[in-house]
């Protein structure tokens, strides 16, 4: 299983992701999210669907949506007549729902001119390919044609299907409405939900447990992102009251190294009768976020127990899909270069439910991320090796410490959604090298896999195209 007895399961995914939601169909968990590239909110990465059968080992292959070039900047003229450049962006996919053998994805698209809305896409499989249900999709600025219509002209649309089959959608700024029977349109006028706390809010979630409707809404943002909730015994749109106890049920835990637990989703696991909250974490600030998951617990009156987020996470929800010993854990890694450390200093409100006057409960915290080669063998999705920005031919080498027969290597690259090419070499003595595997065409997947490597003591991975970094390098006999 794992040589690291105290293994942490947060961060959940080996990539920078935000706004996660999870659905389970058959024996597979599907995770949807916003792909972060550290370019700010003006540009996002290629959207993908991460899949797992055990909630620990996650992978993806390619994108579930075609017809967009996410890396292309489009020129447009804004309302003030200024020339600008912008990108298509895919944000905050809601929980995918199944109806009559079709899968419905509600997701925010932002156009290059920053016009945005929540759209519904449909597919025959939960991992796509997904298509717009009407119109020609979304057209670049200046192109003739008809854009597909949005369900709502705002962001963070999140669907909810009640026990009687009626559908609802919730979006930012506490807005909500009924969905038509075909799930494609609003039915009637939207409403605004009254919450106990004021202030800007996004990333809403609705779920139902034992006859109680729970409306989760975010407050603040960045390192002070929190999740608050209201309860109703009436309906998804009415009767909400402030719960007893901490209505902000999830907030930063600096002692556990979790900052700004924000926009997320609730996943109910029927197999274990558990509720799991998935959420984004601050990372290094901006769009360097990562996905965390922790179990939710409830009091007898239905209120949510304050969730103290941690690195431990959830762990396996089904039998582990990887039982082979990972040779990397006993091996020595070194690289052509290592990126300089990155330090963040933030002020965090440590008591958001009852802040002390004059910012008395605001404290300063520091975190530093390093990018050493050894990070690729620590069973953590939150640490990585990255080559220096000036390194024009980056590589990373492993010494297995003795000659082993290697059957498979798995490479979990950084920014995997943007694609990589690479070359793998092997050596018995560390001096004479021969190529044993190659990815010559740009491929976006995680992990990349090299097989049938044979006897060797040393392996050297050259990253030819794509981001020069690895979250993990797993090695099996």
Predicted regions: what they are:
Residues 146-148, 262-265:
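Short aromatic loop motif centered on NTY/YTY
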Residues 378-437, 441-477:
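Aromatic, loop-rich ligand-recognition surfaces of beta-strand-rich domains
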Residues 1-92, 97-199, 208-213, 218-255, ...:
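Beta-rich carbohydrate-recognition and catalytic domains
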Residues 116, 260-262, 289, 419-421:
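Short, surface-exposed coil-to-beta transition loops
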Residues 218, 234, 262, 269-271, ...:
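Short, loop-centered acidic/histidine patches that primarily coordinate divalent metals
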Residues 315-402, 412-418, 438, 474:
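Disordered, acidic Ser/Thr/Pro-rich linker "stalks" and the adjacent N-terminal cap
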